[in-house]
Amino acid sequence: MRLLLTNDDGIMAEGIQVLAKHFEKDNEVIIAAPDVQRSGSGHCITTVPGELIIQEVKLEGINSKAYSITGTPADCARLGVRKLGNNQIDMVISGINNGFNLGIDSLYSGTVSAAIEAAICETPSIAVSLDTKGGNYDYNIAAEYALEVFSIYKDKYKNKDENVVLSLNVPCLPREKIKGLKVCRVGFKYHLQEIYDKGEKTEELSYNYTDIYYVKRGYAALSPLHYDLTNYKILGDINNLFTEK
């Protein structure tokens, strides 16, 4: 397959380079990433003409073509798909992010936003994030999980009408201690560290069986996302409210 790799940590980040080494073995890979660290940039895009500069760079130990872009992660995803990939990218993989993107933090994440931008460009995508706060982390473990998700997803998901974004979060544990992969919804709790610090029982919080819930228990978490922001639950009520005579 023809893949685009991007991130928000920048073209020189370890995560994207480890990801490239794993994926370029059996796929055609193009790398397009910000020239500098862009974490927390959300879905920001560049609107001023001429401010985006694309420069080809050589990454040590990587055979794939790589491009440094003076823009945001969302810029990189769009330029990668539309311009560098000539609208012939089969899938975009964003990451590996230095740190989790769990719960509401996904809204602030440049890594997740790049994946969503790919879906807006009608290209399925996977955002990959790794817990690095434990200190003894290994990007190779996250890359292996990403490759596993990619392999299953590309072969078995046939609904081409759905521009799906998958968000994968991998805990900071040795490979043999990760309990497995859980497909789950995204939680709403703000910042995982708050939960750790408070020491509250998870059964008492609203994130049961969410991405936060599972990674705290040693699982990798996989959540399907979409960019339709409509609140369908109250859409009819609001319509009735404003059409009453």
UniProtKB/Swiss-Prot annotation:
The keyword tRNA processing does not apply. Keywords: Cytoplasm, Hydrolase, Metal-binding, Nucleotide-binding. Binds 1 divalent metal cation per subunit. This is 5'-nucleotidase SurE. HAMAP family: SurE. One of its GO terms (cellular component) is cytoplasm. It is found in: Cytoplasm. The lineage of its organism: Bacteria, Bacillati, Bacillota, Clostridia, Eubacteriales. Pfam families: SurE. The keyword Secreted does not apply. Its EC number is 3.1.3.5. InterPro entries: SurE (IPR030048), SurE-like_Pase/nucleotidase (IPR002828), SurE-like_sf (IPR036523). It comes from Clostridium kluyveri (strain ATCC 8527 / DSM 555 / NBRC 12016 / NCIMB 10680 / K1).
